[in-house]
């Protein structure tokens, strides 16, 4: 879509426990989504079980499922499909407001460090 603000999120197979245990940690999942809403605009998967994983994104795009919806869904572990949720988590975590984080710190009395998430960070 022309003029649409979007971000790209990725999750490497080398951090996907199922891929590691199968001896196939080479590959990645990449998703392009609207910055504000998490609406999926496109996705690509390179690696083991790519054909199975891309289906999740195809269904999501066709039915208006957002990265937030995927991130809120429990996925089996260890499974390649967990990579779908982990890439969705990239969007979810980056949308947490610093103000909300500070409120939580105050309410729960947390004084330790708070991780800073950016487009190149993997959660």
Language-model segments: which ranges?
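Flexible, glycine-rich terminal cap/loop adjacent to redox cofactors
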Residues: 1-123
């Amino acid at each position: 879509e022309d003029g649409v603000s979007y971000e790209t999120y990725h999750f490497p197979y080398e951090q996907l426990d199922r891929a590691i245990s199968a001896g196939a940690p080479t590959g990645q999942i990449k998703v392009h989504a609207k910055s504000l809403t998490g609406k999926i605009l496109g996705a690509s998967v390179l690696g083991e079980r790519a054909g199975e994983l891309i289906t999740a994104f195809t269904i999501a795009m066709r039915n208006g499922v957002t990265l937030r919806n995927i991130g809120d869904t429990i996925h089996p572990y260890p499974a390649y499909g967990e990579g779908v949720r982990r890439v969705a988590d990239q969007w979810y975590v980056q949308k947490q407001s610093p103000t909300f984080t500070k409120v939580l710190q105050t309410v729960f009395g947390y004084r330790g460090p708070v991780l800073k998430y950016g487009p190149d960070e993997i959660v």
